[in-house]
């Protein structure tokens, strides 16, 4: 909030909670979000904007959702700005692979159930499913996949080919927001559930026994299924 309040310019992403923009009372605000098939600006254009606006406006805030260093291009943007002698600082965020399961009482690690977890992108820079998903599917770890909705059929097929058990799986769309939607099923049932409840991006996919062992919360975010 302090950073946004003191900004001369705010460049914000598609997944940012826009309520934060109310604190930018003295700043020019530019949307630079990128969603599947729709880019307001390319990454190169965003990099150039950061530099040009820092030189002409002063204090630029690059407002991102979650953690800018988990599939967020944060390091790339800082490295680019640093080439031009622009001073940078970071306000850490909570990445959706941790924040969204926690808000739904899903513990990514649990004693005797899951000793570790993977966080994997569902879409590489070549628009292919990450090879790490195949490796993770053979482990006992909890697996969290971001940007994977368009690859859900491939993910399900990998698990069906690599395992004999029918693991629990949760898909949470618009996590932590009032518009959140959630379905819980298994590898064999999830595709039909997603179609039935019309889930789409942005959503995270959580695969593992911890999904079945989610704690019971005393309150829930509005909009859950």
Task: Give the positions of each predicted feature.
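Class I S-adenosyl-L-methionine
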Residues: 1-91, 191, 203
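Small/polar loops that bind or transfer phosphate-bearing groups
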Residues: 12, 92, 121, 146-147
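Short, acidic/turn-prone active-site loops that include or flank metal/cofactor-
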Residues: 15-17, 32-40, 94-96, 116, ...
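Alpha-helix capping/helix-boundary segments
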Residues: 16-17, 69, 96, 151, ...
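Short hydrophobic/aromatic-enriched beta-strand-loop microsegments
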Residues: 28-34, 85-89, 108-115, 164-171
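A contiguous loop/helix-start segment that scaffolds small-molecule binding in enzyme catalytic cores
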Residues: 55-60, 116, 124-225
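Class I SAM-dependent methyltransferase SAM-binding "motif I" and its flanking Rossmann-like core
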Residues: 67-139, 181-184
